[in-house]
Design a protein with these regions (language model features):
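A short glycine-rich, His/Asp/Glu-containing loop-to-beta-strand
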Residues: 15-67, 128-137
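Short loop/turn motifs at secondary-structure junctions and domain boundaries
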Residues: 3-6, 49, 68, 85
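A short hydrophobic beta-strand segment most commonly corresponding to one strand
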Residues: 103-140
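Short, conserved beta-strand element in jelly-roll/cupin
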Residues: 59-61, 70-86
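Short beta-strand segments in beta-sandwich/barrel cores
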Residues: 66, 83-87, 101
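Short acidic, Pro/Gly- and aromatic-enriched capping/linker segments at domain boundaries
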Residues: 2-15
Length: 142
């Protein structure tokens, strides 16, 4: 078993000092080797988080596009199947699929000079996008 914790990268849509949205790539919280249950071999895991407000599964049809908007709350978006993209006001377009986690954290975004606010997003390809949405409490550190 590996002696060093694996590196996991997360995609973070947030706001910069000017209130406009930017895309960052951040490391996941630190993981330690720990047991997860009696008789189960230990695994690399981050500390459990107790900041979940709600969760749901969404299915977005091929061709769906959200238009420019803010996230309704701080939320994790985790694709189960299909692919999608997110574009922030800084012009960065990030494509994601299963195995990639995205933290939508642009609830305080302000309009840019063209009136766009927050981010735009859409489904890639001819398959529906199925995502798990985990909405967080407003004051959680994620």
């Amino acid at each position: 078993m590996a002696e060093t914790a694996p590196t996991v990268e997360l995609i973070h849509v947030t706001t910069g000092p000017d209130g406009l949205t930017v895309t960052e790539r951040l490391p996941a919280p630190e993981m330690t080797m720990r047991p997860v249950g009696q008789g189960i071999p230990p695994i690399w895991a981050s500390d459990p988080q107790a900041d979940v407000q709600s969760w749901s599964i969404w299915t977005l049809p091929p061709g769906w596009r959200g238009g420019w908007h803010r996230n309704p709350s701080r939320q994790w978006v985790m694709p189960i199947s299909g692919r999608w993209w997110v574009e922030t006001q800084d012009g960065v377009r990030t494509e994601m699929g299963p195995g990639e986690a995205h933290l939508g954290d642009d609830t305080n975004a302000v309009p840019d000079s063209t009136g766009r606010v927050g981010h735009d997003s859409g489904v890639i390809g001819d398959e529906p996008l199925v995502v798990m949405i985990v909405q967080l409490d407003d004051h959680s550190p994620a």
